[in-house]
């Protein structure tokens, strides 16, 4: 699928927007209208290597996608890579770019694309996937804008079974 780009201008400092976007545990707060069953795959939900798995609820082609934060350039860019579809055979890419605008506003630009190699996957994408993703990501950025500008707290995704009591490394234990 060719890249899909969505943009929004948010009335918040770039550092605040970056911190929110770079934390995968916050994603369901503004993407739950098209993404379901969101699971963190690693306990730290921020930083390079943080990962999540979720289901894209597209009627014509529901699929699971795994995304991993591949590169961070605070507070400018978050680059994610992943795989999705049947047997995780479709490479998936997401790039968040944040630019400072006058008056402490931030322009958020999100680019999303997939690289299907299997003929069945390419055929499914011809059934309106690009338009569908563009509309969903545009709405997600509007919801992100509303959430950040309102300053209301969001329900973060937690890792099931995470140890609530920090454990000490074996070298420190006696």
Give residue spans per PLM region.
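Hydrophobic ligand-binding cavity/cleft-lining segments
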Residues: 1-44, 163-174
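Short glycine/serine/proline-enriched coil/turn segments at secondary-structure junctions
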Residues: 46, 59-61, 86-90
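Hydrophobic/aromatic beta-strand elements that line small-molecule binding cavities or substrate pockets
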Residues: 6-8, 39-40, 56, 64-71, ...
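Intrinsic-disorder/low-complexity, polar/charged segments enriched in Ser/Thr/Lys/Arg/Asp/Glu/Gln
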Residues: 1-9, 15, 51, 64, ...
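Hydrophobic pocket/interface hotspot
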Residues: 17-21, 27, 52-54, 69, ...
